[in-house]
Amino acid sequence: QEKTYESLAASPFNKIRFCVFPKHYVYNLKEPAQYPFEIRENSPWSPSDFETEKLEKAPRNMFGGIDAMIENPDEVWDYTRPNPSYFEHIENTIARLGTMGIQADLILFHPYDRWGYSRMNLEQQNFYLRYVVNRFSAYHNVWWAMANEFDLFRWKPVSEWESNAETVCRQDPYRHLRSIHNCMTMYDHSRGWITHCSLQRIDLYRTAENVEIWRPQYGKPCVLDEIAYEGNLPFGWGNISGEEITRRFWEPYTRGGYGQHGGTY
């Protein structure tokens, strides 16, 4: 993490996106040092069940996703007992980024999950959201990203996202910026709670050029939070050149939008 701070301090970037929950994906198979919720007594699961060697042998899809999940997360996690140490670490990160002049775009939900956090019921989701917003909203540099790739939550209807957004808006007296990010299907960014469009390319050719369509359609700032990553991975989302990502930055910029860089070497 210190290397990340050093890199940010030497760069011109002034916003970073990061997840509240740990991430389960190819190249992210180690167990986190802490968990966001307390483990129940007599839990049928333990961290040793997710040893890296076991996960490396699990089946994966063409995008790098790996099939693994706690069978009954409600029997493992006490969703009414957030882990204070876990959230203190996030809070310290937000505060430190603020001293560097960097915006902290917090991703509240994501589907890359083996622990079951993406499967919380609506009551559990909104308890978690109240805790997070109450704890972090006082920081001037916080943004709320309702989800990364919301449409990969195949089991979660739009009504739940709207309920989540209502909770965030109600709990946040400072009206921080709010968005929701897509994979292949765009969210309706005309919704009143959305302050800006957080977008991923949905056209493999017009990766950023569609800003000229989205800006007049939604009448809101358009941030290309995912236009693929500069890197050398064997996946199409993570192997474009530095020259190509530079071009993809200029495409939205000249149309009144914004781009975000990511490296996957």
Residue ranges and their predicted role:
Residues I102, P173-R175, R191-Y265:
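Catalytic-core region of carbohydrate-active enzymes that cleave or remodel glycosidic bonds
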